Amino acid sequence: MFDILVYLFESYIHANACPASDQLARKLSAAGFEDEEINEALDWLAGLRRVAAETHPCVAPSRSAVRLYSDYECTRLSAACRGFLTFLEGAGVLDAVSRELIVERAVALSNFTITLGRLKVIVLMVLWQREQPVDTLIIDELLSSDDDEGAPLLH
Protein backbone atom coordinates (compact mmCIF):
# COMPACT_ATOMS: atom_id res chain seq x y z
CA MET A 1 0.00 0.00 0.00
CA PHE A 2 2.76 2.45 0.88
CA ASP A 3 4.44 1.87 -2.49
CA ILE A 4 1.19 2.93 -4.16
CA LEU A 5 1.01 6.10 -2.07
CA VAL A 6 4.58 7.05 -3.05
CA TYR A 7 3.78 6.21 -6.67
CA LEU A 8 0.79 8.58 -6.56
CA PHE A 9 2.90 11.35 -5.07
CA GLU A 10 5.48 10.92 -7.82
CA SER A 11 2.88 10.66 -10.59
CA TYR A 12 0.47 13.46 -9.68
CA ILE A 13 1.62 16.90 -8.61
CA HIS A 14 -1.43 17.39 -6.37
CA ALA A 15 -4.18 15.16 -5.05
CA ASN A 16 -6.70 17.01 -7.22
CA ALA A 17 -4.77 15.87 -10.30
CA CYS A 18 -5.61 12.22 -9.54
CA PRO A 19 -8.32 10.63 -11.64
CA ALA A 20 -11.49 9.22 -10.08
CA SER A 21 -11.06 6.09 -7.95
CA ASP A 22 -12.21 3.59 -10.57
CA GLN A 23 -9.96 5.03 -13.26
CA LEU A 24 -7.08 5.32 -10.79
CA ALA A 25 -7.55 1.67 -9.80
CA ARG A 26 -7.24 0.64 -13.46
CA LYS A 27 -4.09 2.75 -13.89
CA LEU A 28 -2.54 1.28 -10.75
CA SER A 29 -3.41 -2.24 -11.87
CA ALA A 30 -1.83 -1.54 -15.27
CA ALA A 31 1.27 -0.28 -13.43
CA GLY A 32 1.55 -3.72 -11.80
CA PHE A 33 0.12 -3.20 -8.34
CA GLU A 34 -1.94 -5.96 -6.68
CA ASP A 35 -5.71 -5.49 -6.38
CA GLU A 36 -5.66 -5.89 -2.59
CA GLU A 37 -2.99 -3.20 -2.21
CA ILE A 38 -4.88 -0.92 -4.60
CA ASN A 39 -8.09 -1.28 -2.60
CA GLU A 40 -6.27 -0.60 0.69
CA ALA A 41 -4.59 2.50 -0.74
CA LEU A 42 -7.78 3.86 -2.31
CA ASP A 43 -9.75 3.28 0.91
CA TRP A 44 -7.05 5.03 2.92
CA LEU A 45 -6.97 7.96 0.47
CA ALA A 46 -10.77 8.23 0.58
CA GLY A 47 -10.51 8.43 4.37
CA LEU A 48 -7.85 11.13 4.07
CA ARG A 49 -10.02 13.16 1.70
CA ARG A 50 -13.03 12.76 3.99
CA VAL A 51 -11.17 13.77 7.15
CA ALA A 52 -9.37 16.64 5.40
CA ALA A 53 -12.70 17.98 4.13
CA GLU A 54 -14.23 17.76 7.61
CA THR A 55 -11.29 19.43 9.32
CA HIS A 56 -11.83 23.10 9.95
CA PRO A 57 -8.94 25.45 10.56
CA CYS A 58 -8.52 26.03 14.24
CA VAL A 59 -6.93 28.76 16.24
CA ALA A 60 -3.21 28.12 16.08
CA PRO A 61 -1.93 26.79 19.38
CA SER A 62 0.77 28.66 21.20
CA ARG A 63 4.33 27.87 20.04
CA SER A 64 5.01 26.62 23.57
CA ALA A 65 2.02 24.22 23.52
CA VAL A 66 2.83 20.51 23.64
CA ARG A 67 0.71 17.83 21.97
CA LEU A 68 -0.11 15.05 24.45
CA TYR A 69 -0.77 11.67 22.86
CA SER A 70 -3.39 9.26 24.18
CA ASP A 71 -2.32 5.83 25.41
CA TYR A 72 -3.70 4.28 22.23
CA GLU A 73 -1.83 6.77 20.02
CA CYS A 74 1.35 5.95 21.96
CA THR A 75 0.88 2.24 21.25
CA ARG A 76 0.43 2.97 17.53
CA LEU A 77 3.14 5.64 17.17
CA SER A 78 6.60 4.96 18.56
CA ALA A 79 8.60 7.60 20.40
CA ALA A 80 10.63 8.05 17.20
CA CYS A 81 7.45 8.72 15.20
CA ARG A 82 6.09 11.17 17.76
CA GLY A 83 9.47 12.89 17.94
CA PHE A 84 9.59 13.19 14.16
CA LEU A 85 6.18 14.88 14.14
CA THR A 86 7.34 17.28 16.86
CA PHE A 87 10.47 18.03 14.82
CA LEU A 88 8.45 18.75 11.66
CA GLU A 89 6.04 20.97 13.55
CA GLY A 90 8.88 22.86 15.23
CA ALA A 91 10.56 23.32 11.83
CA GLY A 92 7.38 24.87 10.45
CA VAL A 93 6.69 22.02 8.00
CA LEU A 94 3.49 20.99 9.79
CA ASP A 95 0.76 23.03 11.37
CA ALA A 96 -1.53 21.66 14.07
CA VAL A 97 -4.22 20.65 11.56
CA SER A 98 -1.74 18.69 9.42
CA ARG A 99 -0.30 17.01 12.50
CA GLU A 100 -3.75 15.90 13.62
CA LEU A 101 -4.58 14.58 10.15
CA ILE A 102 -1.32 12.61 10.18
CA VAL A 103 -2.03 11.12 13.60
CA GLU A 104 -5.59 10.21 12.58
CA ARG A 105 -4.49 8.58 9.31
CA ALA A 106 -1.65 6.68 11.03
CA VAL A 107 -3.95 5.35 13.75
CA ALA A 108 -6.49 4.37 11.06
CA LEU A 109 -3.98 1.85 9.67
CA SER A 110 -4.77 -0.84 12.23
CA ASN A 111 -3.42 -3.61 9.96
CA PHE A 112 0.05 -2.05 9.80
CA THR A 113 2.83 -1.35 12.25
CA ILE A 114 3.61 2.33 11.87
CA THR A 115 7.35 2.53 11.36
CA LEU A 116 9.14 5.83 10.90
CA GLY A 117 9.39 5.14 7.16
CA ARG A 118 5.66 4.54 6.92
CA LEU A 119 4.93 7.64 8.97
CA LYS A 120 7.02 9.66 6.52
CA VAL A 121 4.81 8.45 3.67
CA ILE A 122 1.72 9.41 5.67
CA VAL A 123 3.20 12.89 6.28
CA LEU A 124 3.98 13.20 2.57
CA MET A 125 0.45 12.21 1.59
CA VAL A 126 -1.21 14.61 4.04
CA LEU A 127 0.91 17.50 2.76
CA TRP A 128 0.15 16.38 -0.81
CA GLN A 129 -3.60 16.22 -0.11
CA ARG A 130 -3.57 19.67 1.50
CA GLU A 131 -1.43 21.02 -1.37
CA GLN A 132 0.99 22.61 1.04
CA PRO A 133 4.31 23.78 -0.40
CA VAL A 134 7.17 21.65 0.87
CA ASP A 135 10.89 22.32 0.60
CA THR A 136 12.82 19.86 -1.60
CA LEU A 137 15.05 18.83 1.31
CA ILE A 138 11.98 17.90 3.35
CA ILE A 139 10.64 15.85 0.44
CA ASP A 140 14.00 14.06 0.21
CA GLU A 141 13.82 13.31 3.94
CA LEU A 142 10.25 12.05 3.67
CA LEU A 143 11.18 9.79 0.75
CA SER A 144 14.22 8.35 2.54
CA SER A 145 13.73 5.15 4.50
CA ASP A 146 14.98 4.85 8.06
CA ASP A 147 13.48 1.41 8.48
CA ASP A 148 14.99 -2.02 8.22
CA GLU A 149 13.16 -2.23 4.91
CA GLY A 150 16.24 -0.65 3.41
CA ALA A 151 16.08 1.22 0.12
CA PRO A 152 14.73 4.70 -0.32
CA LEU A 153 11.05 4.92 -1.19
CA LEU A 154 11.62 6.92 -4.37
CA HIS A 155 10.81 4.85 -7.45
UniProtKB/Swiss-Prot annotation:
Name of this chain's protein: Protein Smg homolog
Pfam families: DUF494
Family recorded in the similarity comment: Belongs to the Smg family.
Coiled-coil segments on the chain, per record: none
InterPro entries the UniProt entry points to: Smg
Organism for this UniProt entry: Azoarcus sp. (strain BH72)
